[in-house]
Amino acid sequence: GALTVGGLSVLLSYANQYMKPFNDISSVITEMQNALACAGRIFALLEEKEESADPAGTIDTVTGNVTIDDVAFSYDKEKKLIENFNLDVQPGMRVAIVGPTGCGKTTFINLLMRFYDVDAGKVCIDGKPIDKLSRHALRSCFGMVLQDTWIKQGTVRDNISFGKPDATEEEIINAAKEAHSWEFIKRLPKGLDTVLSEDSISQGQKQLLCITRVMLCLPPMLILDEATSSIDTRTELQVQEAFDKLMQGRTSFVVAHRLSTIRNASLILVMKDGKIIEQGRHEELLEKKGFYYNLYNSQFQAS
């Protein structure tokens, strides 16, 4: 009963052939699991409610009066996120929105831009309900700089002039200087004609490009969501000065996580659980020694 080398070779060959179907089955099951996961996302997208029809309403001249009348909204109909929300913002006001994570700050911005429709109440710009305006007309009223930056595949010029395709080179350069992005742009291999990819510049440089877009378009109203979060301290001070200049005479909404950046706001809204629990200027809220007072002091103690 001795096993020869030839017999061992045949045995191993048969064993390999025997295991091959099991390996194939395992691979098929893995592929099926991946396909089911992909299908789940596709079906979830197909089951989403269709976006409501876009009306043809426009605004010729925007003064910047924003009114929010008894607005309610929730992502999950079983759990209210924003309810009984009322606000009257006069033209040129600088409104800061603060509060703990999940209180509804970003949701408020999404409703203002009509990324979502309100469940109840209405939002008006210069007296016109935003659901009567075309989305293009509404969103053209605002310039946005968000914490999460977005750069498209293309040149620096394309990324800056995204909202104003007919901008001249002089206008682009002036906007870049205002946003303090020109220093790094002119050091790129081809300057404004350098082709960008997602990883070709730093997060801070991406944020400066997003700020430059707004400086170029000069919209009638601004939305800033921690717009300088990825920028070094020295550049942040310079950009903040540029923003202060840009916000003069423009209605501005500033979502703030660092409370030191909103001391000069015309109105500070303190949100919690989807409701405004305090509002006023910085000094007034500190004197009340309420939620804002504790939030403000906790940041400085932590730092």
Where are these regions (language model features)?
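Conserved catalytic core of two-component sensor histidine kinases
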Residues: 12, 19, 139
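Conserved E/DxxT/N motif and adjacent residues on the DHp alpha2 helix
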Residues: 44, 51, 161
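Cytosolic ends of transmembrane helices, especially the final helix of ABC transmembrane type-1 domains
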Residues: 17-45
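ABC-type nucleotide-binding domain
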Residues: 54, 60-303
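Signal-transduction coiled-coil helices of two-component systems
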Residues: 32, 49-52
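Short, charged helix-helix connector/hinge segments
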Residues: 5, 52-54
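Membrane-water interface of transmembrane alpha-helices in multipass transporters/channels
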Residues: 1-13
